[in-house]
Amino acid sequence: MHMRRLLFCALMAGLFLAALGGRASAYPQFQFSSGTTRCSQCHYSPAGGGLITSWGRDESGDTISLGGDGAFLHGLWEPPSWLALGADVRLAALANASGGPESPQFAFFPMQTDGYARFAFGDQVSLYLEGGIRGDVGRDESFSGRTSSVGDRFISNEHYLMWHPSATGPYVRAGRFFAPFGLRFVEHIFYVQRYTGYDLYNETYNVSGGYVGDDWELHVSLFTPPPTSFPEPLQSVGIRESGLAAYGEKRFNGMAMVGLQARLGTGSEVSRYVGGAVGKLWLEDIKMLALGEADFVRQIVSVGSGTVGQNQFVSYLGATFFPIRGLMAGIAYERFQEDLAVAGTGHNAVDLEVNFFPWAHIELLALGRYQFIGPSSATDEASASLFMLQLHYYL
């Protein structure tokens, strides 16, 4: 009877979440800086991201924010032990200057509306469901225009079944999610996500397994895009690839980590072979986390009856400061070299970001980004700027 009730609740939650898409992401800046060394301490996912655990909820009120109760519904109601729920809502306002007669452009829109549910079948097996409404600037800015397009933007980026008998140790999961790889930022616009197969709404179906230890972890995934026969809410965007991804991480003294990674993806139009590394270093005296990622990419494009290949490089190097509780401010430099053999094909970006957590469940964000192509920003056509304000509420 208990199992049948769980299955019924899972079905009802799936229908509910389908009516709420965005991206189930994490904040890699909180590793080490919050006193937490493993991303899976705060998230149910063994690689971090998505619905947060009871530990993560405690941290959101006691460490990350200025105060408040981080529990679901602010502690007004506690779900049963076999059920975990959550939601993310983001509202954004932006100014985008990319050149041309219509620049700059201004927009205000709902960036993310996601709901999460996790059902535990005993102590070892769980079902995870996520669903929401794709963020969209849209051409019709009226309220009626916004609401009339909601039905066309249903999406479920993550849904999987997982065997994970303990917080550390082996695990296996199967379903739709991003195969563990890279720094895994909230900001999908960063080059290290856009050009390695981890762009927005590009989650794949995977069979993934690995091991999470106290000071190391390993994740290996076989991935493939959603079948074209699947309904629209289960489809992905971007390059369709199938292949293998692997990520390994070693942590040192609760203050640093080094990770190695590889991703081999093949498709009918484009194939990519990626190898790289990530790293973090926490400096307690100055309350600063340095973090970076660098990847070499071999991209092969099908042209007629043949192929054309090019070598690429993509990187991120940043520093995030935590001057006071509830506030973090970061600066970063990004580089994407579209073809290492051709001069002037480099894309550069400088990012300034401030995140303020005044109370548990609430985040205010300001992001400034300047991009330029080539060795300098000598012309307007070769540069672009973005400024964005965000209000984030998580349940």
Residue ranges and their predicted role:
Residues 46-48, 91-97, 131-137, 176-180, ...:
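Transmembrane beta-strands of outer-membrane beta-barrel pores
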Residues 79-81, 119-123, 165-167, 212-217, ...:
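Outer-membrane beta-barrel strand-turn architecture
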Residues 36-46:
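The canonical Cys-X-X-Cys-His
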Residues 81, 102-111, 152-157, 201-205, ...:
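Residues that define the transmembrane beta-barrel architecture of outer-membrane proteins
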Residues 83-89, 127-129, 170-172, 218-220, ...:
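Transmembrane beta-strands of outer-membrane beta-barrel proteins
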Residues 239, 246-340:
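Detector for outer-membrane/organellar transmembrane beta-barrel domains
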